[in-house]
Amino acid sequence: MSNLTLSQFLQQEKGNLTPELAQVIDTIAATCKTIDQALQKGALAGILGSAGNENVQGETQKKLDVISNDYLIDALKVHPHVGGLASEELDDFTPAQENGEYLVLFDPLDGSSNIDINMCVGTIFSILPAKNAITQAQDFMQAGTQQVAAGYVLYGPSTMMALTVGNGVAFFTLDPVTQTFLLTTENVQVSADTQEFAINASNQRHWEQPVKQYIEELLAGKTSVREKDFNMRWVACMVGDVHRILCRGGIFLYPYDLKDPKKAGRLRLMYEANPMSMLIEQAGGASTTGRVRILEIEPTELHQRVPVIIGSKNEVERVTSYH
C-alpha cells in the first residue's frame, strides 16, 4: 500500500482541520521544500556564513536565516487564508490578507549555528485562529492552548515534517525524487520513562538549584536515587532534540538561569516553546517552565522568552516537583 501524501492526509483529518487550514499547512510544507533545496546547495550557492546583521533577538543572522524567513513571508503573506505573520527574525508582525482566518508564527531556521558545519537545522511553525478582519499585534497574544496546528520540518539526512492538528502527531518524509511529503508514521507516542536527557551543561553554574539537583541525580546514575544510568544528548537545535524525543523518548531542558537574569528564559514562547509543547503533549509527553504548563501561559509580547522543560512525562513531572 502506498503512503498517503500530506495533502491526502489533511483531507482525511477531522476536528480543527478546515479546508482553509489544510491549504495553509500545504503552503508551509511547499515553502519548506524550497528551504530544503537552498540548504542542499549550501556553499555551492554562496549562501553559508553570516548575513552581517543582527535580528530582533540580538543574534547574528546567517544568510540562510534571512533567505528562509523571506521564503516564508513571501509565500504566506499573499495566502488568502492568512491574516498575519510573526517571525522570530523580525521586530514586528507582518500583516497579510484581510479576513484571513489564521495567524502563522514561525522560527524560519532553528539551530542556524549548525548550518556552516552541515548539521541538522529545522523550521518550526505555529498556527492560531485570527481574531479580527484586519490583524493587529494584540491578536497574536493567545495562549498555546489556542493553537489549531503546530509542527516542524527537520532538515537532516532525510527531510521530515512532524505535524499535529490537535489529533495526535504524525511524521512525513520528503521523497527526494517526487518532492512530496509522504506519511511515514502515525500516532507518534513519547515514552513516559527515559534514560536520555538534553541540556547545555556549560551553563550549569548559572542554573537554579532545582535543575542542578535534577541533573546531578542523572549524572550520578546508578549510584544516585535514580538507580539507573542516563545518557546526555545535545545537538544545539531544538528541532533535532525534540525529534529525538518524539522518536525514542527523553527530556529536553533549557531552564531559567542567572547568566542573564533579566531574561525569563532563552527560548521564545510563540515561535518555539508553544508549537513544540503542543507536539509533545499531543504525543503523550509533558511541557513546563518548571513552574507552569507552557501552553497555559498568556503571552504579553511577540518575542517573550520562557524556560522550557519538555519530553517524557515522568521525568518532566519529577523535575517540576523540585521547583
Swiss-Prot record:
Pfam families the UniProt entry points to:
FBPase, FBPase_C
Q: Which UniProt keywords apply?
A: Carbohydrate metabolism, Cytoplasm, Hydrolase, Magnesium, Metal-binding
Pathway field of the UniProt record reads:
Carbohydrate biosynthesis; gluconeogenesis
Which residues does Mg(2+) 1 bind?
88, 107, 109
Q: How is the cofactor bound?
A: Binds 2 magnesium ions per subunit.
- Cofactor(s) needed by this chain: Mg(2+)
Provide the E.C. number(s) assigned to this enzyme: 3.1.3.11
- List the Gene3D superfamilies: 3.40.190.80, Fructose-1,6-Bisphosphatase, subunit A, domain 1
What CDD domains does the record point to? FBPase
Top class in the EC scheme: hydrolase
Q: Name one GO biological process term.
A: fructose 6-phosphate metabolic process
InterPro entries associated with the record: FBPase_C_dom, FBPase_class-1, FBPase_N, FBPtase
What interactions and quaternary structure are annotated? Answer: Homotetramer.
Q: What is this protein called?
A: Fructose-1,6-bisphosphatase class 1
Source species: Acinetobacter baumannii (strain AYE)
